[in-house]
Amino acid sequence: MKIIGIDPGYGILGYGVLEKSGNKISHITHGVITTDKELSMYKRLQVIYEEFLRLLKEYSPDACAIESLFFYKNVKTAIRVGEARGVILLATSQMDLPLYEFTPYQVKNNITGYGHSDKKQVQKMVKMLLNLDKIPRPDDAADALAVAWCLAVETRF
């Protein structure tokens, strides 16, 4: 089973693809979708949508895991990230993929055993759990791998 994990954003959206076979979870790829600040928000959403569809077609995941919005101090940022999430949800639905959401607390708790871990702890554990040579960069890609890991270890899979 292939899982694509998403750390939503509109400037930088992280993704990570894992494969689960029995009890083994393997890293396939990770990266980010970036959008140019000079583009209108509509065009930025279009870039996210088209690039995400390309990833879905290239890696053919069986499921998608996405981090849910939890809390943002900046309302404008929360709205923009919510719009980017909406584009991901639409593309996932169009490809008829099951979608699973995890809160930041669930992701941290699942990866480190402590729901209030900081980013560096999560990144180090992602590196260790996936047997990677180095911590995935940028941070958004490491976060997306952590989200995918959460789904991979769920009992329903």
Curated annotation (Swiss-Prot):
Domain of life of the source:
Bacteria
Q: Which reaction does it catalyse?
A: Endonucleolytic cleavage at a junction such as a reciprocal single-stranded crossover between two homologous DNA duplexes (Holliday junction)
Primary residence = cytoplasm
- Residues that bind Mg(2+) 2: E67
Task: Provide any one GO MF term from the record.
Answer: DNA binding
User: E.C. number, please?
Assistant: 3.1.21.10
Protein residues bound to Mg(2+) 1:
D7, D140
Which EC class heads this enzyme's classification?
A: hydrolase
Matches recorded under CDD domains: RuvC
Q: Which Gene3D superfamilies match?
A: Ribonuclease H-like superfamily/Ribonuclease H (3.30.420.10)
Q: Can you tell me which residues form the catalytic site? A: D7, E67, D140
Instruction: Give the InterPro entries listed for this entry.
Output: RNaseH-like_sf (IPR012337), RNaseH_sf (IPR036397), X-over_junc_endoDNase_RuvC (IPR002176)
Q: Which GO terms describe its cellular component?
A: cytoplasm; Holliday junction resolvase complex
Q: How is the cofactor bound?
A: Binds 2 Mg(2+) ion per subunit.
Q: Which UniProt keywords apply?
A: Cytoplasm, DNA damage, DNA recombination, DNA repair, DNA-binding, Endonuclease, Hydrolase, Magnesium, Metal-binding, Nuclease
The answer to keyword Cytoplasm applying to this record is yes
Cofactor field: Mg(2+)
Q: Which GO terms describe its biological process?
A: DNA recombination; DNA repair
Task: Tell where it localizes.
Answer: Cytoplasm
Q: What does this protein do?
A: The RuvA-RuvB-RuvC complex processes Holliday junction (HJ) DNA during genetic recombination and DNA repair. Endonuclease that resolves HJ intermediates. Cleaves cruciform DNA by making single-stranded nicks across the HJ at symmetrical positions within the homologous arms, yielding a 5'-phosphate and a 3'-hydroxyl group; requires a central core of homology in the junction. The consensus cleavage sequence is 5'-(A/T)TT(C/G)-3'. Cleavage occurs on the 3'-side of the TT dinucleotide at the point of strand exchange.
Spell out the family assignment given in the record's similarity comment.
Belongs to the RuvC family.
User: NCBIfam families, from UniProt?
Assistant: PRK00039.2-1, ruvC
- Partners and quaternary state? Homodimer which binds Holliday junction (HJ) DNA. The HJ becomes 2-fold symmetrical on binding to RuvC with unstacked arms; it has a different conformation from HJ DNA in complex with RuvA. In the full resolvosome a probable DNA-RuvA(4)-RuvB(12)-RuvC(2) complex forms which resolves the HJ.
| Cited HAMAP family | RuvC
Q: Which protein, by its recorded name, is this? A: Crossover junction endodeoxyribonuclease RuvC
Say which species the protein is native to: Thermosipho melanesiensis (strain DSM 12029 / CIP 104789 / BI429)
